[in-house]
A protein has these predicted regions:
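Short hydrophobic/aromatic beta-strand or adjacent loop that forms the aromatic wall/cage
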Residues: 74-78, 125, 206-208
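N-terminal periplasmic/intermembrane-space "pro-region" immediately following the signal or transit peptide
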Residues: 37-45, 61-70, 92
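Surface-exposed strand-loop-strand hairpins of Gram-negative outer-membrane beta-barrel proteins
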Residues: 68-79, 114-116
């Protein structure tokens, strides 16, 4: 189980390295946020792989989320669902921060009111999110990063030509939740592209609010 996790994390790290090398490909990207998402994911997956023997047993923890996002042309609404958390043992936590990996499935609907492409599409994403949590008083402050794989129902929407239905999704978010982690609200940035597998490769940069509820 731990060896499988290490292989998955190393593969995701290699994808993150590829993504970092493509940071100047598209003018519409937000370089600081995209670079932070990819570099943060790369370092986090690498750290997790190195510390694979220091994880506690994964525990059931069902959460559902809704996220709204938009860029200069497109808008999206996403529903997310995760069923478990895999946390590092307290002695191995980086700088005293809780380090938690939550495999998450996300279903999204995109829409556009301009351009020659489709007016809407559906996206399905799988991403192992890494969350750094700092409990402080009655609140929990966090930073979340992750790189995952996405499948689009169409390869173009609005004026964005994606060329492939298969895409990569990298994200970074900042949030706050109550002490019991029952309800969380945060900001999320998400970039979707195919890493230059095929061109044109018009990236999409969604920024918006996320609301997460523990079921």
């Amino acid at each position: 189980m731990k060896d499988t996790m290490k292989k998955i994390l190393l593969r995701l790290t290699s994808f993150a390295v590829m993504g970092l090398s493509m940071t100047q490909v598209h003018a519409e990207e937000v370089p600081f946020l995209k670079n932070s998402a990819i570099l943060g994911s790369l370092l986090s997956y690498g750290f997790a792989a190195i510390n694979k023997d220091n994880f506690q047993a994964c525990t059931p923890n069902r959460k559902a989320s809704i996220q709204t996002g938009s860029d200069e042309e497109l808008s999206s609404v996403s529903l997310g669902f995760s069923v478990s958390d895999c946390a590092l043992k307290p002695a191995a936590q980086p700088m005293g921060l809780q380090f938690v990996i939550s495999p998450t499935v996300i279903a999204s609907g995109w829409s556009s009111n301009s351009g020659p492409g489709a007016r809407s599409l559906t996206e399905l994403t799988l991403v192992p999110k890494v969350q750094y949590v700092l409990p402080y008083g009655s609140l929990r402050w966090d930073v979340t990063v992750g790189v995952g794989i996405s499948l689009l129902s169409k390869s173009s929407v609005g004026s964005r030509i994606k060329s492939t239905n298969f895409q990569f999704s990298d994200e970074i978010g900042f949030g706050v939740s109550d002490a019991a982690d029952k309800l969380r609200i945060g900001f999320t940035y998400r970039h979707i592209s195919n890493l230059g597998i095929s061109v044109p490769n018009n990236g999409v940069d969604f920024r918006g609010l996320t609301l997460t509820y523990k079921l």
